[in-house]
Amino acid sequence: MKKYGAPQISSGDLLRDAVARGTELGLRAKAAMDAGELVSDELVLALIRERLSRPDALRGFILDGFPRNIAQAEALSDMLGRLGQPIDAVVLMNVDSAALLKRLTGRRTCSRCGRLFNVYTSPPTADTPCVDGRLEHQLVQRPDDNEDTIRNRLDVYAAQTRPLVEHYRGRGLLRTVEAEGDIEDVFARLERAVTPPAVRRSRKPRR
């Protein structure tokens, strides 16, 4: 996240990179990812631990998609405690299941420039040429962005990830953001949720 000078660390991206590179961890994770199941805590924690040790994460970071269950949350707290970097906030991006299904099944990535599109809500147009100047993007869909796999992921979320809501709410860390609507509106809600009130007041223009 350039605005905050902190790297966005996505557990999903770390896993997919490990799979693409054919590492030992990646090969062990591939079967579970293809089926829409949660990868074992051991594998995810190993990747996260390695990523947090890099210099750009020493002053702060944003974890995306992690933790996903209570065991991971407790292991993360232990890890960050040893690093002297306690959790500042936990954000729940709240989206209706039907809207989420449409968002994920419609997700496409241009294999040329890496830009993300959605065939339902934000398809490419002539005003969004590819990085090489072509008007056509080479759109590809992730193998796990199909309806059956996504529904299975939602079931796994209900069973294993939803308990985290109460886990972090009880610790006073949870911030809930309504994540439907325009990207700019959602980001504004997110900023309000994670910015302390005193900081928000100091940003208001003085008359």
Kindly label every feature range from the protein language model.
Residues 1-207:
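Glycine-rich phosphate-binding loop of ATP-dependent small-molecule kinases
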